[in-house]
From Swiss-Prot:
Coiled coil: none annotated. Disulfide bonds: none annotated. It is an enzyme of class 3 (hydrolase). This is Crossover junction endodeoxyribonuclease RuvC. Mg(2+) 2 binds at E67. Homodimer which binds Holliday junction (HJ) DNA. The HJ becomes 2-fold symmetrical on binding to RuvC with unstacked arms; it has a different conformation from HJ DNA in complex with RuvA. In the full resolvosome a probable DNA-RuvA(4)-RuvB(12)-RuvC(2) complex forms which resolves the HJ. The gene is ruvC. One of its GO terms (molecular function) is crossover junction DNA endonuclease activity.
Length: 174
């Protein structure tokens, strides 16, 4: 049984979700949001970095899935999102986690069965798959969806001898 961390990065709110992959599905462990509040970007990135490390040290996942940067209409927002991703990736790499990246479409496809699912549909499927009785915050729900996607991807690759190689920086390339 593998503990998996999912990260939905953001420069203001970073969602996290931890699931246990039992081989027959995922079991909910924890989820929440790292809120950076107002402040200068370097300070907010440090909060993301420290928050992700704290989650890793608290729950002990061995692998992490994180959402890839999407093309945003606002270049400044995309850059800030990329920097928040970087802070989370460095935190995971420093803790020795294997790290895989997924597009939003891949996550939606894995969890809801369609890459065009909206946030509410993904949230409802996360609740169903993890047998949750209350709705997680939307950023935490997205992070749980990323963790579920990572569990599904790992389980489909590992029997074929794939998904275990590590490249520079401990990042798992799929």
């Amino acid at each position: 049984m593998t503990l998996i961390l999912g990260i939905d990065p953001g420069s203001r709110i970073t969602g996290y979700g931890v699931v246990r992959d039992t081989g027959r599905g995922c079991v909910y462990v924890a989820s929440g949001c790292i809120r950076t509040g107002a402040g200068e970007l370097p300070d907010r990135l440090q909060i993301v970095y420290r928050g992700v490390r704290e989650v890793i040290q608290t729950y002990g996942p061995v692998t992490m899935g994180i959402e890839k940067v999407f093309m945003a209409r606002n270049a400044d927002s995309a850059l800030k999102l990329g920097q928040a991703r970087g802070a989370a990736i460095v935190a995971g790499a420093e803790e020795g986690l294997e790290i895989a990246e997924y597009t939003a479409t891949q996550v939606k496809q894995a969890v809801a069965g369609t890459g065009g699912a909206n946030k509410e549909q993904v949230q409802m499927m996360v609740m169903h798959l993890l047998k949750l009785t209350t709705k997680p915050q939307i950023d935490a729900s997205d992070a749980l969806a990323i963790a579920i996607c990572h569990a599904h991807t790992r389980s489909s690759l590992l029997p074929h001898g794939l998904g275990t190689a590590r490249s520079r920086g401990g990042r798992l390339r799929l």
